Amino acid sequence: MTHPLVEPIRSLHRRIRADVVAACERAALESLSNVASDEEGDTIYAIDRVAEHVLIEEIARTIATDSAPVVLVAEGVPGGRVIVPGGADASRAAWTIIVDPIDGTRGLMYQKRPGWILTGVARHQPLQREGSEQARQAVLSDIELAVQTEIPLVKQHLCDELWAVRGHGASATRVNRLTGDSTPLLLRPSSSATIAHGFAMISRFFPGIRAELAAIDDEIVEEILGPPQQGKAQLFEDQYISSGGQLYELMAGHDRFVADLRPLFERRRGADGPALCCHPYDLCTELIARELGVMVTDEHGRPLDAPLDVTSDVTWAGYANAHIRQLIEPLLQQALTRRGLLA
């Protein structure tokens, strides 16, 4: 089964990818890493603006019409949510489209790691008449189409494109951006029943709570693998500052477990907690991972249900398979409970 928005969104992603790579080729690292603004959802860097300029223009040109507008949720747009085309009647919208134009900005702008374009599509949930209750807001689990496209480093000529329609599996291709040729790509999550000698980690990207996150990580690993052995590495970690990139590593079989627990600490500490957490747009392509067999949950082991906005904080865990989940999830929840982090 296909979806009417698969090809328009893939085309949108290709244009964003081309424009961002071209900007990276032209610009100095310092200019791309300048702070453009501080939005509700995240800090916006100069490189982000390159993608945002394309986003509304392409959606207006290829997807949205006055008779069938689109509700666009994205970083960088006014209020994090706009109607495309502007001035259209939102009650007539068929789709809510949530986009992260560049996920992994920090690694990409310094040319350390590829970034990703992330898009999720859900049926629009219209608001009811004034004075009545609002219809339920669309959440991550309502997404029925997800598209994820790699933004390569300047020195990299191959890049991957992934997409999935809910209940109908996932597809992927590897594209040569120099020739335009593409070949089918088989993504297969790890089937290993252990984390030993594999990649498994808890995200701790930024200062503030890294010691506590590392302590949880070490507790889980020691419970599973025993105390560290002198001169031997029991397992490895990769702090990829991109939620889409982390999902890709699970899909590709490179990683066996990833968890981002930052919102739990913010909830516990209130205003004194870390200001930067994962948001719904960072995880709007988790459908692709689930269609490939990756198990993606919240801190309680439930499906992700954050609203499609740019401000909600999202705690998530990804397990390559059911064996890994059975191995880690109880220990993770015990560690969180001991610290009073599970509500």
Stretches found by the model and what they are:
Residues 1-102, 322-323, 329-333, 337-343:
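N-terminal subdomain of lithium-sensitive/metallo-dependent phosphomonoesterases centered on the IMPase/IPPase/PAP
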Residues 6-9, 13-16, 20-24, 28, ...:
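An extended, acidic
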Residues 37, 73, 82-100, 106-167:
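Active-site-adjacent structural elements in enzyme catalytic cores
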Residues 42-50, 108-111, 241-244, 276-283:
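Short, conserved micro-motifs enriched in small and acidic residues
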Residues 47, 57-64, 73-83, 120-130, ...:
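Short regulatory "switch" loops immediately downstream of catalytic or recognition motifs
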Residues 104-105, 289:
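Conserved S/T- and glycine-rich ATP-binding loop of Class I adenylate-forming
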